Protein backbone atom coordinates (compact mmCIF):
# COMPACT_ATOMS: atom_id res chain seq x y z
CA UNK A 1 0.00 0.00 0.00
CA UNK A 2 1.49 3.34 -1.10
CA UNK A 3 0.99 6.45 0.96
CA UNK A 4 1.15 9.91 -0.59
CA UNK A 5 3.15 12.13 1.76
CA UNK A 6 4.02 14.95 -0.66
CA UNK A 7 1.80 17.75 -1.86
CA UNK A 8 0.28 17.89 -5.34
CA UNK A 9 3.03 20.12 -6.69
CA UNK A 10 5.92 17.95 -5.52
CA UNK A 11 7.57 15.34 -7.75
CA UNK A 12 9.94 12.60 -6.64
CA UNK A 13 12.50 10.41 -8.39
CA UNK A 14 13.87 7.40 -6.54
CA UNK A 15 16.77 4.95 -6.66
CA UNK A 16 17.99 4.19 -10.18
CA UNK A 17 15.82 6.88 -11.76
CA UNK A 18 17.25 9.53 -9.43
CA UNK A 19 20.82 8.37 -9.98
CA UNK A 20 20.35 8.24 -13.74
CA UNK A 21 18.82 11.73 -13.75
CA UNK A 22 21.80 13.07 -11.79
CA UNK A 23 24.32 11.37 -14.07
CA UNK A 24 22.61 12.48 -17.28
CA UNK A 25 22.34 16.10 -16.14
CA UNK A 26 25.97 16.34 -15.04
CA UNK A 27 27.32 14.55 -18.13
CA UNK A 28 25.26 16.82 -20.39
CA UNK A 29 26.82 19.91 -18.79
CA UNK A 30 30.30 18.44 -19.28
CA UNK A 31 29.53 17.69 -22.94
CA UNK A 32 28.23 21.25 -23.37
CA UNK A 33 31.50 22.93 -22.41
CA UNK A 34 34.14 20.36 -23.36
CA UNK A 35 34.41 21.69 -26.93
CA UNK A 36 35.80 24.95 -25.46
CA UNK A 37 38.71 23.18 -23.74
CA UNK A 38 42.30 23.80 -24.79
CA UNK A 39 44.15 26.10 -27.19
CA UNK A 40 42.07 24.92 -30.15
CA UNK A 41 38.74 25.03 -28.32
CA UNK A 42 35.72 26.75 -29.85
CA UNK A 43 33.62 29.63 -28.51
CA UNK A 44 29.92 29.78 -27.61
CA UNK A 45 27.59 32.54 -28.79
CA UNK A 46 25.06 33.30 -26.06
CA UNK A 47 21.99 35.45 -26.70
CA UNK A 48 19.82 36.79 -23.91
CA UNK A 49 16.08 36.32 -24.42
CA UNK A 50 15.21 39.35 -22.27
CA UNK A 51 17.72 42.00 -23.35
CA UNK A 52 18.52 40.47 -26.78
CA UNK A 53 22.24 41.09 -26.17
CA UNK A 54 24.89 38.73 -27.51
CA UNK A 55 28.02 37.42 -25.81
CA UNK A 56 30.83 35.39 -27.37
CA UNK A 57 32.92 33.44 -24.86
CA UNK A 58 34.71 30.17 -24.18
CA UNK A 59 34.99 30.72 -20.44
CA UNK A 60 33.33 27.75 -18.74
CA UNK A 61 32.03 29.66 -15.71
CA UNK A 62 30.58 32.44 -17.87
CA UNK A 63 28.80 29.95 -20.14
CA UNK A 64 27.31 27.93 -17.30
CA UNK A 65 26.11 30.86 -15.21
CA UNK A 66 24.49 32.45 -18.28
CA UNK A 67 22.19 29.56 -19.17
CA UNK A 68 19.13 28.52 -17.12
CA UNK A 69 19.29 24.90 -15.98
CA UNK A 70 16.54 22.73 -14.51
CA UNK A 71 18.51 19.60 -13.61
CA UNK A 72 19.75 19.79 -9.97
CA UNK A 73 22.89 17.75 -10.71
CA UNK A 74 23.78 20.14 -13.52
CA UNK A 75 23.50 23.00 -11.03
CA UNK A 76 26.06 21.29 -8.77
CA UNK A 77 28.60 21.41 -11.61
CA UNK A 78 27.72 25.05 -12.28
CA UNK A 79 28.44 25.79 -8.62
CA UNK A 80 31.85 24.09 -8.63
CA UNK A 81 32.81 26.01 -11.78
CA UNK A 82 31.86 29.25 -9.98
CA UNK A 83 33.95 28.28 -6.96
CA UNK A 84 36.89 27.43 -9.22
CA UNK A 85 36.51 30.82 -10.91
CA UNK A 86 36.40 32.65 -7.57
CA UNK A 87 39.25 30.71 -5.96
CA UNK A 88 41.75 30.41 -8.81
CA UNK A 89 40.29 32.27 -11.79
CA UNK A 90 40.83 29.57 -14.42
CA UNK A 91 40.25 25.85 -14.90
CA UNK A 92 36.47 26.23 -14.83
CA UNK A 93 35.97 24.11 -17.94
CA UNK A 94 38.49 21.49 -16.79
CA UNK A 95 36.80 20.97 -13.42
CA UNK A 96 33.37 20.63 -15.05
CA UNK A 97 34.60 18.18 -17.69
CA UNK A 98 36.55 16.06 -15.19
CA UNK A 99 33.50 15.84 -12.90
CA UNK A 100 31.36 14.73 -15.83
CA UNK A 101 33.93 12.11 -16.89
CA UNK A 102 34.16 10.73 -13.34
CA UNK A 103 30.38 10.34 -13.28
CA UNK A 104 30.40 8.77 -16.75
CA UNK A 105 32.88 6.15 -15.51
CA UNK A 106 30.84 5.65 -12.32
CA UNK A 107 27.69 5.06 -14.36
CA UNK A 108 29.44 2.26 -16.28
CA UNK A 109 30.63 0.64 -13.05
CA UNK A 110 27.15 0.74 -11.53
CA UNK A 111 25.36 -0.39 -14.68
CA UNK A 112 27.77 -3.02 -16.00
CA UNK A 113 29.73 -4.24 -12.98
CA UNK A 114 26.95 -3.75 -10.40
CA UNK A 115 29.32 -1.96 -8.01
CA UNK A 116 27.74 -0.10 -5.10
CA UNK A 117 28.11 3.73 -5.22
CA UNK A 118 29.77 3.76 -1.78
CA UNK A 119 32.46 1.40 -3.08
CA UNK A 120 33.06 3.73 -6.01
CA UNK A 121 33.30 6.70 -3.63
CA UNK A 122 35.92 4.90 -1.52
CA UNK A 123 37.88 4.06 -4.67
CA UNK A 124 37.67 7.64 -5.93
CA UNK A 125 38.97 8.92 -2.59
CA UNK A 126 42.00 6.62 -2.76
CA UNK A 127 42.60 7.59 -6.39
CA UNK A 128 42.26 11.32 -5.68
CA UNK A 129 44.81 11.09 -2.85
CA UNK A 130 47.25 9.21 -5.11
CA UNK A 131 46.75 11.71 -7.95
CA UNK A 132 47.31 14.74 -5.73
CA UNK A 133 50.40 13.14 -4.19
CA UNK A 134 51.86 12.56 -7.67
CA UNK A 135 50.99 16.13 -8.67
CA UNK A 136 52.81 17.48 -5.60
CA UNK A 137 55.91 15.42 -6.41
CA UNK A 138 55.88 16.64 -10.02
CA UNK A 139 55.58 20.32 -9.02
CA UNK A 140 58.57 22.66 -9.39
CA UNK A 141 59.22 25.79 -7.32
CA UNK A 142 61.41 28.51 -8.88
CA UNK A 143 60.46 31.30 -6.47
CA UNK A 144 64.03 31.46 -5.13
CA UNK A 145 65.21 32.82 -8.51
CA UNK A 146 63.39 36.02 -9.53
CA UNK A 147 64.30 35.68 -13.21
CA UNK A 148 63.13 32.07 -13.46
CA UNK A 149 59.98 32.82 -11.45
CA UNK A 150 59.13 35.70 -13.78
CA UNK A 151 59.59 33.31 -16.72
CA UNK A 152 57.25 30.85 -15.00
CA UNK A 153 54.62 33.57 -14.59
CA UNK A 154 54.89 34.54 -18.26
CA UNK A 155 54.58 30.90 -19.33
CA UNK A 156 51.53 30.41 -17.06
CA UNK A 157 49.90 33.53 -18.54
CA UNK A 158 50.59 32.30 -22.08
CA UNK A 159 49.13 28.89 -21.28
CA UNK A 160 46.01 30.47 -19.79
CA UNK A 161 45.58 32.90 -22.69
CA UNK A 162 46.26 30.30 -25.39
CA UNK A 163 42.66 29.09 -25.18
CA UNK A 164 41.20 32.60 -25.16
CA UNK A 165 40.43 35.31 -27.68
CA UNK A 166 43.82 36.84 -26.85
CA UNK A 167 45.72 33.77 -28.08
CA UNK A 168 47.01 35.54 -31.21
CA UNK A 169 48.65 38.22 -29.05
CA UNK A 170 49.36 36.03 -26.02
CA UNK A 171 53.03 37.10 -25.81
CA UNK A 172 52.01 40.76 -25.54
CA UNK A 173 49.23 40.17 -23.02
CA UNK A 174 51.30 37.71 -20.97
CA UNK A 175 53.87 40.48 -20.49
CA UNK A 176 51.12 42.97 -19.56
CA UNK A 177 49.56 40.60 -17.03
CA UNK A 178 52.90 39.58 -15.49
CA UNK A 179 54.09 43.19 -15.13
CA UNK A 180 50.77 44.17 -13.53
CA UNK A 181 50.86 41.27 -11.05
CA UNK A 182 54.50 41.83 -10.09
CA UNK A 183 53.58 45.42 -9.19
CA UNK A 184 51.27 44.00 -6.50
CA UNK A 185 54.34 42.65 -4.65
CA UNK A 186 52.70 39.42 -3.54
CA UNK A 187 49.21 40.80 -2.91
CA UNK A 188 46.23 38.97 -4.42
CA UNK A 189 44.00 42.07 -4.35
CA UNK A 190 43.20 42.69 -8.01
CA UNK A 191 41.32 45.89 -7.09
CA UNK A 192 44.63 47.71 -7.58
CA UNK A 193 44.54 46.78 -11.27
CA UNK A 194 42.02 48.80 -13.26
CA UNK A 195 40.90 47.49 -16.66
CA UNK A 196 39.49 50.07 -19.09
CA UNK A 197 37.85 49.09 -22.39
CA UNK A 198 37.99 51.56 -25.29
CA UNK A 199 36.39 50.84 -28.65
CA UNK A 200 38.66 51.26 -31.65
CA UNK A 201 42.03 49.98 -32.72
CA UNK A 202 42.99 46.34 -32.35
CA UNK A 203 43.74 44.07 -29.40
CA UNK A 204 47.50 44.40 -29.85
CA UNK A 205 47.16 48.18 -29.25
CA UNK A 206 46.30 47.47 -25.59
CA UNK A 207 48.84 48.69 -23.04
CA UNK A 208 49.71 48.87 -19.34
CA UNK A 209 49.84 52.29 -17.69
CA UNK A 210 51.58 52.67 -14.34
CA UNK A 211 48.90 54.76 -12.73
CA UNK A 212 45.16 54.86 -12.09
CA UNK A 213 42.92 56.05 -14.94
CA UNK A 214 39.37 57.32 -14.37
CA UNK A 215 36.91 57.81 -17.23
CA UNK A 216 36.12 61.42 -16.26
CA UNK A 217 37.37 64.98 -16.84
CA UNK A 218 37.81 68.13 -14.74
CA UNK A 219 35.12 70.80 -14.53
CA UNK A 220 34.89 73.80 -16.86
CA UNK A 221 37.63 76.46 -16.64
CA UNK A 222 39.71 74.31 -14.30
CA UNK A 223 43.41 73.43 -14.77
CA UNK A 224 44.06 70.22 -16.72
CA UNK A 225 46.98 69.20 -14.48
CA UNK A 226 47.32 69.10 -10.68
CA UNK A 227 50.58 68.35 -8.86
CA UNK A 228 50.88 67.09 -5.26
CA UNK A 229 47.19 66.33 -5.27
CA UNK A 230 45.25 66.24 -2.00
CA UNK A 231 42.03 64.45 -2.84
CA UNK A 232 38.70 64.40 -1.01
CA UNK A 233 36.46 61.59 -2.28
CA UNK A 234 32.79 62.09 -1.43
CA UNK A 235 29.30 60.80 -1.99
CA UNK A 236 27.13 63.87 -1.40
CA UNK A 237 24.48 65.98 -3.14
CA UNK A 238 25.83 69.09 -4.83
CA UNK A 239 22.96 69.72 -7.22
CA UNK A 240 20.82 72.12 -5.14
CA UNK A 241 21.38 75.26 -7.17
CA UNK A 242 17.63 75.42 -7.81
CA UNK A 243 14.66 75.73 -5.49
CA UNK A 244 13.96 72.14 -4.44
CA UNK A 245 11.52 71.94 -1.56
CA UNK A 246 9.77 68.65 -2.21
CA UNK A 247 6.32 68.01 -0.76
CA UNK A 248 5.95 71.62 0.38
CA UNK A 249 3.60 74.36 -0.84
CA UNK A 250 4.41 78.01 -0.32
CA UNK A 251 2.92 81.31 -1.44
CA UNK A 252 4.77 84.52 -2.17
CA UNK A 253 3.29 87.91 -2.95
CA UNK A 254 6.30 89.14 -4.91
CA UNK A 255 9.20 87.88 -6.99
CA UNK A 256 11.54 89.43 -4.42
CA UNK A 257 10.53 86.83 -1.83
CA UNK A 258 11.13 84.06 -4.35
CA UNK A 259 14.57 85.54 -4.93
CA UNK A 260 15.17 85.47 -1.17
CA UNK A 261 14.37 81.77 -1.10
CA UNK A 262 16.79 81.09 -3.94
CA UNK A 263 19.40 83.21 -2.20
CA UNK A 264 18.99 81.15 0.97
CA UNK A 265 19.51 77.98 -1.06
CA UNK A 266 22.68 79.44 -2.59
CA UNK A 267 23.99 80.50 0.82
CA UNK A 268 23.43 76.97 2.07
CA UNK A 269 25.44 75.60 -0.86
CA UNK A 270 28.15 78.22 -0.35
CA UNK A 271 28.53 77.19 3.29
CA UNK A 272 28.79 73.53 2.28
CA UNK A 273 31.56 74.30 -0.24
CA UNK A 274 33.33 76.42 2.41
CA UNK A 275 33.28 73.42 4.77
CA UNK A 276 34.78 71.23 2.05
CA UNK A 277 37.53 73.78 1.35
CA UNK A 278 38.65 73.59 5.01
CA UNK A 279 39.98 70.08 4.35
CA UNK A 280 42.99 71.66 2.64
CA UNK A 281 42.39 69.90 -0.66
CA UNK A 282 43.02 70.81 -4.28
CA UNK A 283 40.89 68.05 -5.85
CA UNK A 284 37.30 67.07 -5.03
CA UNK A 285 35.78 63.89 -6.49
CA UNK A 286 32.06 63.26 -6.05
CA UNK A 287 30.07 60.16 -6.90
CA UNK A 288 27.01 62.32 -7.53
CA UNK A 289 26.40 65.28 -9.83
CA UNK A 290 28.00 68.68 -9.26
CA UNK A 291 25.86 71.46 -10.74
CA UNK A 292 27.14 74.69 -12.29
CA UNK A 293 27.00 76.90 -9.19
CA UNK A 294 28.99 74.63 -6.81
CA UNK A 295 31.43 73.87 -9.65
CA UNK A 296 32.01 77.62 -10.04
CA UNK A 297 32.55 77.95 -6.28
CA UNK A 298 35.17 75.18 -6.41
CA UNK A 299 36.91 76.91 -9.33
CA UNK A 300 37.00 80.22 -7.43
CA UNK A 301 38.61 78.45 -4.46
CA UNK A 302 41.27 76.81 -6.67
CA UNK A 303 39.82 73.31 -6.22
CA UNK A 304 39.41 71.03 -9.22
CA UNK A 305 36.14 69.08 -9.17
CA UNK A 306 35.18 65.75 -10.75
CA UNK A 307 31.51 64.76 -10.82
CA UNK A 308 29.47 61.59 -11.25
CA UNK A 309 32.36 59.15 -10.86
CA UNK A 310 30.98 55.61 -10.97
CA UNK A 311 30.75 53.69 -7.70
CA UNK A 312 33.34 51.05 -8.58
CA UNK A 313 35.76 53.70 -9.81
CA UNK A 314 35.34 55.77 -6.62
CA UNK A 315 35.88 52.77 -4.34
CA UNK A 316 38.97 51.66 -6.25
CA UNK A 317 40.32 55.23 -6.37
CA UNK A 318 39.92 55.54 -2.59
CA UNK A 319 41.84 52.27 -2.22
CA UNK A 320 44.80 53.23 -4.42
CA UNK A 321 45.14 56.83 -3.18
CA UNK A 322 44.82 55.92 0.49
CA UNK A 323 41.69 57.98 1.08
CA UNK A 324 38.16 57.12 2.13
CA UNK A 325 34.71 58.01 0.81
CA UNK A 326 32.92 60.57 3.01
CA UNK A 327 29.43 62.05 3.01
CA UNK A 328 29.65 64.62 5.83
CA UNK A 329 32.16 67.44 6.23
CA UNK A 330 31.91 68.54 9.86
CA UNK A 331 35.16 67.01 11.15
CA UNK A 332 38.06 67.44 8.69
CA UNK A 333 40.59 66.05 11.19
CA UNK A 334 38.94 62.61 11.17
CA UNK A 335 38.89 62.24 7.38
CA UNK A 336 41.61 60.45 5.41
CA UNK A 337 42.51 62.31 2.23
CA UNK A 338 43.77 60.59 -0.89
CA UNK A 339 47.18 61.56 -2.22
CA UNK A 340 49.05 61.25 -5.50
CA UNK A 341 51.87 63.10 -7.26
CA UNK A 342 50.07 64.20 -10.43
CA UNK A 343 46.54 64.24 -11.82
CA UNK A 344 46.32 65.12 -15.50
CA UNK A 345 43.69 65.03 -18.21
CA UNK A 346 44.61 62.76 -21.13
CA UNK A 347 42.92 61.52 -24.29
CA UNK A 348 42.59 57.81 -25.07
CA UNK A 349 40.95 57.16 -28.41
CA UNK A 350 38.52 60.04 -28.60
CA UNK A 351 37.56 60.08 -24.92
CA UNK A 352 38.92 62.25 -22.08
CA UNK A 353 40.35 60.46 -19.04
CA UNK A 354 42.02 61.47 -15.80
CA UNK A 355 45.34 59.81 -15.01
CA UNK A 356 46.45 59.58 -11.36
CA UNK A 357 50.23 59.06 -11.21
CA UNK A 358 52.36 58.36 -8.13
CA UNK A 359 49.48 57.00 -6.05
CA UNK A 360 49.98 56.19 -2.38
CA UNK A 361 49.44 52.52 -3.21
CA UNK A 362 52.43 52.20 -5.53
CA UNK A 363 51.15 48.93 -6.96
CA UNK A 364 48.20 50.62 -8.69
CA UNK A 365 48.13 50.33 -12.46
CA UNK A 366 45.68 50.34 -15.36
CA UNK A 367 45.41 48.04 -18.36
CA UNK A 368 43.79 49.78 -21.34
CA UNK A 369 42.13 47.33 -23.74
CA UNK A 370 41.45 48.28 -27.35
CA UNK A 371 39.20 46.33 -29.70
CA UNK A 372 36.82 46.57 -32.63
CA UNK A 373 33.56 45.48 -30.95
CA UNK A 374 32.00 45.44 -27.51
CA UNK A 375 31.87 41.62 -27.59
CA UNK A 376 35.60 41.45 -28.35
CA UNK A 377 36.42 43.82 -25.50
CA UNK A 378 34.18 41.99 -23.02
CA UNK A 379 35.74 38.60 -23.84
CA UNK A 380 39.24 40.13 -23.77
CA UNK A 381 38.51 41.49 -20.28
CA UNK A 382 37.28 38.08 -19.08
CA UNK A 383 40.35 36.38 -20.56
CA UNK A 384 42.74 38.87 -19.03
CA UNK A 385 41.00 38.63 -15.66
CA UNK A 386 41.48 34.84 -15.72
CA UNK A 387 45.20 35.29 -16.40
CA UNK A 388 45.56 37.94 -13.67
CA UNK A 389 43.72 35.75 -11.16
CA UNK A 390 45.90 32.70 -11.84
CA UNK A 391 49.10 34.76 -11.70
CA UNK A 392 48.10 36.45 -8.44
CA UNK A 393 47.44 33.04 -6.86
CA UNK A 394 50.78 31.76 -8.19
CA UNK A 395 52.63 34.53 -6.35
CA UNK A 396 51.28 32.95 -3.14
CA UNK A 397 51.50 29.26 -4.12
CA UNK A 398 54.63 29.46 -6.28
CA UNK A 399 54.82 25.83 -7.43
CA UNK A 400 54.14 25.03 -11.08
CA UNK A 401 53.37 21.90 -13.10
CA UNK A 402 53.48 21.14 -16.81
CA UNK A 403 50.45 21.49 -19.09
CA UNK A 404 49.52 19.92 -22.39
CA UNK A 405 48.02 16.86 -20.69
CA UNK A 406 51.33 16.10 -18.94
CA UNK A 407 50.08 16.62 -15.37
CA UNK A 408 46.92 14.59 -16.00
CA UNK A 409 48.90 11.68 -17.45
CA UNK A 410 51.40 11.76 -14.56
CA UNK A 411 48.48 11.57 -12.14
CA UNK A 412 46.86 8.82 -14.20
CA UNK A 413 50.06 6.77 -14.00
CA UNK A 414 50.16 7.16 -10.20
CA UNK A 415 46.50 6.17 -9.90
CA UNK A 416 46.99 3.08 -12.07
CA UNK A 417 49.93 2.08 -9.86
CA UNK A 418 47.75 2.57 -6.79
CA UNK A 419 45.05 0.35 -8.32
CA UNK A 420 47.48 -2.58 -8.45
CA UNK A 421 47.86 -2.41 -4.67
CA UNK A 422 44.12 -2.48 -3.93
CA UNK A 423 42.02 -5.60 -3.62
CA UNK A 424 38.42 -6.11 -4.60
CA UNK A 425 36.00 -3.93 -6.51
CA UNK A 426 37.54 -0.71 -5.21
CA UNK A 427 40.43 -1.26 -7.63
CA UNK A 428 37.95 -0.97 -10.52
CA UNK A 429 36.87 2.45 -9.24
CA UNK A 430 40.50 3.55 -8.94
CA UNK A 431 41.16 2.45 -12.53
CA UNK A 432 38.04 4.36 -13.61
CA UNK A 433 39.46 7.51 -11.99
CA UNK A 434 42.65 7.07 -14.05
CA UNK A 435 40.60 6.72 -17.24
CA UNK A 436 38.69 9.91 -16.42
CA UNK A 437 41.99 11.79 -15.98
CA UNK A 438 43.16 10.54 -19.38
CA UNK A 439 40.01 11.97 -20.93
CA UNK A 440 41.32 15.53 -20.50
CA UNK A 441 44.27 15.13 -22.92
CA UNK A 442 41.94 13.12 -25.18
CA UNK A 443 39.52 16.06 -25.38
CA UNK A 444 42.44 18.47 -25.98
CA UNK A 445 43.54 16.39 -28.97
CA UNK A 446 39.98 15.98 -30.30
CA UNK A 447 39.35 19.74 -30.12
CA UNK A 448 42.57 20.36 -32.06
CA UNK A 449 41.39 18.04 -34.84
CA UNK A 450 43.99 15.32 -34.30
CA UNK A 451 43.61 11.56 -33.85
CA UNK A 452 43.24 11.45 -30.08
CA UNK A 453 43.57 7.67 -29.85
CA UNK A 454 47.02 7.72 -31.41
CA UNK A 455 48.28 10.88 -29.69
CA UNK A 456 47.10 9.98 -26.20
CA UNK A 457 48.42 6.43 -26.45
CA UNK A 458 51.83 7.83 -27.44
CA UNK A 459 51.69 10.29 -24.53
CA UNK A 460 50.68 7.53 -22.14
CA UNK A 461 53.55 5.33 -23.33
CA UNK A 462 56.02 8.20 -22.94
CA UNK A 463 54.89 9.12 -19.41
CA UNK A 464 54.60 5.51 -18.24
CA UNK A 465 58.16 4.89 -19.51
CA UNK A 466 59.51 7.62 -17.26
CA UNK A 467 59.66 10.69 -19.54
CA UNK A 468 57.66 12.80 -17.10
CA UNK A 469 57.86 16.10 -19.05
CA UNK A 470 56.07 14.81 -22.18
CA UNK A 471 52.86 16.44 -23.31
CA UNK A 472 50.73 17.23 -26.35
CA UNK A 473 52.12 19.74 -28.84
CA UNK A 474 48.80 20.75 -30.39
CA UNK A 475 50.41 23.06 -32.95
CA UNK A 476 52.18 20.17 -34.66
CA UNK A 477 50.13 17.18 -33.48
CA UNK A 478 53.07 15.46 -31.80
CA UNK A 479 54.42 14.56 -28.37
CA UNK A 480 56.97 17.10 -27.11
CA UNK A 481 58.81 18.25 -23.99
CA UNK A 482 56.47 20.69 -22.23
CA UNK A 483 59.31 22.26 -20.26
CA UNK A 484 61.09 23.23 -23.47
CA UNK A 485 57.89 24.56 -25.04
CA UNK A 486 57.09 26.59 -21.91
CA UNK A 487 53.66 24.98 -21.41
CA UNK A 488 53.43 25.62 -17.67
CA UNK A 489 50.39 25.76 -15.40
CA UNK A 490 49.75 26.69 -11.79
CA UNK A 491 50.03 23.84 -9.29
CA UNK A 492 47.21 25.37 -7.23
CA UNK A 493 44.93 25.39 -10.28
CA UNK A 494 45.54 21.71 -11.11
CA UNK A 495 45.14 20.68 -7.49
CA UNK A 496 41.85 22.58 -7.22
CA UNK A 497 40.54 20.97 -10.43
CA UNK A 498 41.18 17.40 -9.23
CA UNK A 499 39.99 17.87 -5.64
CA UNK A 500 36.85 19.83 -6.60
CA UNK A 501 35.90 17.44 -9.40
CA UNK A 502 36.27 14.34 -7.21
CA UNK A 503 34.24 15.96 -4.41
CA UNK A 504 31.46 16.95 -6.83
CA UNK A 505 31.35 13.42 -8.25
CA UNK A 506 31.17 12.02 -4.71
CA UNK A 507 28.27 14.32 -3.82
CA UNK A 508 26.25 13.21 -6.85
CA UNK A 509 27.11 9.53 -6.41
CA UNK A 510 25.48 9.61 -2.98
CA UNK A 511 22.14 10.75 -4.43
CA UNK A 512 19.35 8.16 -4.46
CA UNK A 513 16.37 10.49 -4.26
CA UNK A 514 15.49 13.75 -6.04
CA UNK A 515 12.52 15.73 -4.70
CA UNK A 516 11.35 18.77 -6.64
CA UNK A 517 8.97 21.32 -5.19
CA UNK A 518 7.54 24.18 -7.20
CA UNK A 519 8.00 27.71 -5.84
CA UNK A 520 5.34 28.84 -3.41
CA UNK A 521 2.54 30.91 -4.89
CA UNK A 522 0.28 33.43 -3.22
CA UNK A 523 -2.66 31.03 -2.97
CA UNK A 524 -0.61 28.01 -1.90
CA UNK A 525 -1.23 27.09 1.71
CA UNK A 526 1.61 27.03 4.19
CA UNK A 527 1.99 23.78 6.05
UniProtKB/Swiss-Prot annotation:
Cellular location(s): Cytoplasm
GO biological-process terms attached to the record: chaperone mediated protein folding independent of cofactor; protein folding
GO cellular component terms attached to this protein's record: chaperonin-containing T-complex; cytoplasm
GO molecular function annotations of the record: ATP binding; ATP hydrolysis activity; ATP-dependent protein folding chaperone; unfolded protein binding
Superkingdom, taxonomy of origin: Eukaryota
Residues with N-acetylserine modification: 2
Record keywords, A-Z: Acetylation, ATP-binding, Chaperone, Cytoplasm, Nucleotide-binding
Pfam families: Cpn60_TCP1
Family: Belongs to the TCP-1 chaperonin family.
Subunit structure: Heterooligomeric complex of about 850 to 900 kDa that forms two stacked rings, 12 to 16 nm in diameter. Interacts with PLP2; this interaction leads to inhibition of CCT complex mediated actin folding.
Protein name: T-complex protein 1 subunit beta
Species of provenance: Saccharomyces cerevisiae (strain ATCC 204508 / S288c) (Baker's yeast)
Lineage: Eukaryota, Fungi, Dikarya, Ascomycota, Saccharomycotina
